[in-house]
From Swiss-Prot:
Organism: Mycobacterium ulcerans (strain Agy99)
Stated name of the protein: Nucleoside triphosphate pyrophosphatase
Transmembrane segments: none
SUPFAM superfamilies in the record: ITPase-like (SSF52972)
Family membership: Belongs to the Maf family.
Localization per record: Cytoplasm
One Pfam family this sequence matches: Maf
Source taxonomy: Bacteria, Bacillati, Actinomycetota, Actinomycetes, Mycobacteriales
Xref: HAMAP family: Maf (MF_00528)
Protein's UniProt keywords contain Cytoplasm: yes
Length: 216
């Protein structure tokens, strides 16, 4: 019975999986994302950046499980994810301040950006890594142009500081999204179609995943 482990503190990713009928064990990685990005250098593509970050998260969680939760590491699949918005030639993670979020939203208003989401899986069998795989999905997000009052009210909620690109599709920010080209679940943080492919390549069916990780 393969346990699914989500290596992320993202409530959005957890919600996507739970709405898809899976209740994963959550183990947060705590990797140093800034150090990893600095190591990649300026030549790294957006797709590579989020993929490498997702891989680092999945591998760190797998290492933690092997050392601290042997019963889980006996048969589990760890999935790590990372999302970033690419617009105006730069990758944007979570804004650090409200002013950063304000400037980002002003640059996005009435335009579109590309949301890159890296997905990485590590399968553990008897405390050993038996499979690794990773891939990136890309989704185009079209933004509305919120009024100054609406933007300030949104920024005051604090939501924009918690998510990559300073926006959500499934939360308060959804009011200011006019369309999505690609997988909506990837915009929330974990793409179900790509995750299904990665899980399948690890030798696990969705039926088995449902059976091993039922909702309470």
């Amino acid at each position: 019975m393969t346990r699914l482990v989500l290596g992320s503190a993202s409530s959005g990713r957890l919600k996507v999986l739970q709405q898809a009928g899976v209740d994963p064990l959550v183990v947060v990685s705590g990797v140093d994302e800034d150090a990893i990005m600095a190591g990649l250098g300026p030549a790294a593509t957006p797709a590579d950046v989020v993929r490498v970050l997702a891989r680092a998260k999945a591998e760190q969680v797998a290492t933690t499980l092997t050392g601290q939760q042997a019963s889980v590491a006996a048969d589990c699949l760890v999935i790590g994810c990372d999302s970033m918005l690419y617009i105006d030639g730069r990758l944007c993670g979570k804004p650090e301040t409200v002013d950063d979020a304000r400037q980002l939203w002003r640059s996005m208003a009435g335009r579109c950006g590309h949301l890159y989401t890296g997905h990485s899986v590590v399968r553990l069998t008897e405390q050993r890594v038996t499979h690794r795989d990773d891939e990136t999905s890309t989704t185009t997000v079209h933004f509305a142009a919120p009024s100054d009052d609406d933007l300030e009210a949104y920024l005051a909620t604090g939501e924009s500081l918690k998510v990559a690109g300073g926006f959500t599709l499934d939360g308060l920010g959804g009011w200011f999204i006019t369309g999505v080209e690609g997988d909506p679940s990837a915009v929330v943080g974990i793409g179900l179609p790509l995750t299904r492919d990665l899980i399948s390549r690890a030798g696990i069916s969705i039926a088995a995943l449902w059976a091993s990780n039922p909702l309470p």
